[in-house]
Every structure is written in C-alpha cells, then in structure tokens.
Amino acid sequence: SGGAKWNFLALWGSVVKNGGNDAQALKFVTDVFKNVVVLPKDARESSDAFYKKGQGDVLINYENEVILAAQQGKTDTSYIIPPVNISIEGPVAVVDKNVDKHGNREVSEAFVKFLFTPEAQREFAKVGFRPVDPTVSKEVKSKFPYIARLYTVADLGGWSGVQKKFFADGAIFDKIQRGRR
C-alpha cells in the first residue's frame, strides 16, 4: 500500500538522512522487518490491528493515525515522532476524463483550491494532519511534536528512482520480504 511504502522510506531515510549509508539502511530495515508480525493492506487497517486486536508491540504509521486514535479514545499510548522524518505528500488532482464526463470541472477545481485555504488547513490540523499553509502551521505548531528535519521522496531520488531501487520486482523490498520467510 502507499502507507507501507511511506513507512519503508521513513525507516530507510532515518539511516541515510542521519549520516548512514545504504548498507547500514538495508541492515536496519531488514532487522525491523524481521520483527513485523502483520503487514496490513493500509494505514487504517494497521491501526485497527494494533489498537483493536493487540497485534504487535510497535506501530509504524502516519502521525495523523496516532493522533486520531487518541482523539477517539482508542489509545493512551505515547508515541514518538523521529527528529528526522519523511514528509508524506498526499497528492490531489482533478481527473480530466471524469470531470468532463460528469460536467463538474468547475466545482472539482474549486474544491481542490479550497483544500489549501487556511480554513481547510485548520480542519485538517484538528484530526492530526500537519498544515501546509505557513500561517496555519504557525497557529497549530504547539499541537504537533517538533521535527528537526523533514526530507521528501525527491531527496531519495524521486518516485521513479525510489520505485526502481526499492519497490520494483526483485528490488530491495522484495529481497527483505524473501528473507522474512
């Protein structure tokens, strides 16, 4: 899933963005995956497996999932946000073929614009998403743990490079998974 890729890249980056090399990152990520008891299909299923079913001792997940679980009373477990972490970029797009077919391009484009307004960003922050609007980010800064340095997929070679290196058939992720069996 997308969440699994982000988690993998966060683990890898926690080594290489802290001065380590690829060999050290491979060992670290391999060691982490040796301890994985369940690989759910997405972030919400991961949360449910951990909080509702008690599977696993540690949950690696999106920050907003942990915040949402706490808000819903599913957990009082403390959580750690690494000081060097990956910025998860959730894309949003208007799909030409669909909006043209349904005649709703104008409202769809307006909605996409709205998502980046201070009003929408404040709502996202309420459920654990870090705002991308600088003003709102300052307003809610105290509600989120400090992160010293965020890196992006671009810092790891961009999506095409990341896909080829880590997630293509026979790439690093497959090799790690084969070692778990």
Where are these regions (language model features)?
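A conserved helix-loop-strand patch within extracytoplasmic ligand-binding domains
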Residues: 1-3, 10-13
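Generic recognition of short, well-ordered alpha-helical interface segments
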Residues: 2-6, 24, 41-42, 87, ...
